[in-house]
Structures are given as structure tokens and as C-alpha cells.
Amino acid sequence: MRILIIIILIIIVFLVKDTIKKNKKVNSKSPCGPFAFPILGNIIQYFFYQILNIKEHSMIERYSRKYDGITRIWFGDIFILYVSNYEIVKCFQKEENFFDRPSTFVPTWRYMSSNGGGIMSSNDEKWKRAKTTFLKSLKIHGKKYLIEKKSIEFVNSIEKFSNSNQVFYPKQYSQGFTSSIFFKYMFNEDISIDNKFLKEIGTAVGMVFTKNSHLTVFDCFGILSPFYDLFFKFRLRPIEILKKTIDKQLTNHLNSMDSKMGDHQSRDIMDDLLIEYGSLNEISNQDRIQINQICFDVMSTDIGTVATTIDWVLLQLCNRQDLQEIICNEIQDTIKIKRNNVINDGGGGADTDNLFINLCDKQSIPYLIAFIKETMRVFSNGWSLPKTSKHDQICANYFIPKGSILFINYFSIHLNEEFFKNPREFNPARYLDDSIPIPDLHFGIGQRGCPGRFVAMDQVFLCIANTLLKYKIKSIDGKKIDDTIQFSVYLKPKDFGILLEKRNKLFVND
């Protein structure tokens, strides 16, 4: 009996200490958050919101409004700060203290990042080297004409749906579009957009984000993390598929590179990575893992987030026919000018009925750019990749302790009335002037923002512009498509289908 009483007392003491630890302010300026229960922390509230069918991004957005834009959350042992207070975000952008990623965050993060490798997850000189090498190579191999060519291929590949009046499901083709571009500039492989292999790659990328979008019990409690492999191998399989695909490309490139390194003209980004990290005859296992992770980071963001943004824009164009026509009028005027220029330059024999939008036309179609940005603001931006603090620091009158896991909550920032008038209203016109007091946050902030942001935006612009040039986009039943946000590592729409109505050729004629 005494032993039982002692055990009960020990448990009570542990629960009390853990409750105090999770809720006590270590500094008078420490951020606040909802009451954290012993052991589980705020997992209780998480499941409560799930029962109410309120997703994670909406739960955090509610807490953000309640706690002045910085919310303390405990998921088991894991302490996280979600930040939407823009003064603190600016501090993150400027202060070197907040540049790093938490390389040993949780098992899921460690697996996805190869223990803090690549571009997205590495730190210090390792990160600078990876980013510099990738950007330098992207400028050479990520040429504008490649994106333009693939956008035309996209338009042509979906023509069969218009001709047969079949329902068109964008997800597979948007992933095929971004995958095809990725494989060309990264591995110098020209694969058609509707290729079955690219469909498999797109599916694997989608599974990576879907299966790894939630923390598991093995992530939340450190004592259980060693058992992650045993119970969650199915979560890791999509990651393995993608990394094996990349490793195969790496091996093929090593075997086919020129014999003289100094005279070698790189064919693609993979060649440039091998030149930077290895040699023709051998490459260390550590560098091989780093190259693989760099490619994995680019693949997952390009095929995942860019393709999802294209899907969101297509969905919103269906739901807003009036705005679709405004954009189409801009495109029509642009094509008319291009057509007249061809004729005036003596190109009367040229096929002026088959002109397409190019990147040089972006300034002539401002409403489409605004529409894309507004779609990203309202629908596709959740929160950032995690940051960490190297040491204690006061930021905008809040105490950020050393080793904190920090997520910038873009979803809440974009719904803040201080920055966006009527923030829940879909209004692309807000991006047509300089009235928004904060910079674009769609691709992250500062030095740790997305290194390929301009290429990503070009892909979305050209894919949508040339699709609207050739087709009117409509819902299947004439009703609005459900645009409820599905939570993942990024915010995505439910799978949906649309109808493509071919536009009359008079659309581009005088």
C-alpha cells in the first residue's frame, strides 16, 4: 500500500512540475498561449478543434488574434512559438540570431531534411554554399524560354479535354508541368507533361507533404522518438521514392560527365552540384547526401507548392468569372499588340493566330499578377519552415528564449486588418497599387526565403496566362467549386474538376 501511495505521490509531483514548466513565464516578457496540460500540453486543444472540424491553420489563427500575434504552444515535449506579429517578423528578417533552422527538430523533420542538409534545412556555411551553387546554376539552366515552351506544351496537352468536353482535373497536369520543368533544368531530361513517370513523381511529392504534415506521438515525445522507424515506415516511403530517383540521376551523371573537369560544360544543375561538391572519379557519401537533399528540396517545393498554387488559381478563376474576363481582356489586348507588331515588321506570312504569352508580357497583364498574389494571400500560404533562436533575445518587447522553435504564421498576417482592408474579401485590385504596407511574403522573408521564387512565379504566370488565352474555365455544374482549405505542409484545395471551353479565334483577331 505504501509503495502505491509513493508512486501516486511521485506521479502527482511530476504532473504539477510539468504543468508549471509548460505554463510559467520564464521572463516577464515571455509570450502567452492557451493553458498547457501536463504531459500532453496543447494536444488537448488540438483534438478539441479537430472534433469541431477546425483545422490547424485556423486554430493557430484564432490564437494569434487572442495573443497579440505570438502564441506559445506545447505539443507534448515540443515548445513552439507561432508568430504573426509583424514587428517580430521584421526582427527575424534582420537579426542573424534567427537565420538558422532547427536541424534536429523532430524525427519527421530529420528524415525529410537528411539531418539538416540541403538548401531549406542546413545552416551557416553549409547553407550558403548550397544556396550559392544552386542559384548560380539556376540562372544558367532555368532559362525563360524553357518555362515558355512548357507552358505552351501544357496548353496543348489539355486540348483533348476541351475537344471531347471531358472533365479536366488540374492536379495531375499542374504537377506534370512543374515536374517537366524541374527534370529539364535539374537533370537535362525533356519529359512530356502527361508522362506516366511524372504522374508517379507528383503523387509521391503529394504524399510526402500529406503524410508528414502532422506531428506524430513519436515527434511530440522525445522518449518515443527512437521507435519512429518501426511504426512509421509508410510515412517515409514517398521520401525514399524521390530520393532514390534523385540518386539514380546522380549516378548516371557521374558516369557520363566529361573526362576533363576543367573543360567540362555543365549540362544541368546536377552537373554543377557534382563539380562543386565532388570530382569525376569519386564523391564522398556525405557530399552525395547533400547533393541529393538539395535536389529533394527543390523538387518538393517546385512540384508541390508551385503546382498547388496553379490549382488554387484555376479554382478561383472558375469561381470568379467576372475577374476571369478582366484578365482575358488584358491578354486579348496584349496578343493584339503582338499580332500587329508581327504584321508591321513584315511578318504577314507568320502564323499570327498561334501567338502565346511570354514573360516579356508580364507588365501588360497586371491584373493576372494581382490575381495570383491575392490567391496566394487568401488560400495557399500557411506558415514558414521552422526557424530557431541561437540565444535569448527581446524582439518587439517579447522574450524569445534560446533554442525556441519558431514558425512565421503567414496565414494570420494575411488576414490582419492592419495590413489588408477587408482581409477576408477576395480582391486582387489591392495589389495594383502601393497601398499594402508590408512586402510580399508569399515566398518567405529575408535570406532564408525561397531561392527560386522568381522562377516559381514565372511558372504560375505563364501556365495560367496561356491557359486563359486558349480556354474559358468553367465549373462542371455552373456552381462555385468548394474552396475549403485542406491542411498540409502547404495549404491545398480539395481535388476538383473543371470544364475547358475553347475560345473563338476571334478572341485574338481585330
Curated annotation (Swiss-Prot):
EC numbers on record: 1.14.-.-
A Pfam family of this chain: p450
Matching Gene3D superfamilies, A to Z? Answer: Cytochrome P450
Record GO terms (molecular function): heme binding; iron ion binding; monooxygenase activity; oxidoreductase activity, acting on paired donors, with incorporation or reduction of molecular oxygen
Transmembrane residue ranges: 1-21
Per the record, GO CC terms?
A: membrane
Q: Which UniProt keywords apply?
A: Heme, Iron, Membrane, Metal-binding, Monooxygenase, Oxidoreductase, Transmembrane, Transmembrane helix
Which residues participate in heme binding? Answer: C450
Official protein name in the record: Probable cytochrome P450 517A2
Q: Which gene encodes it?
A: cyp517A2
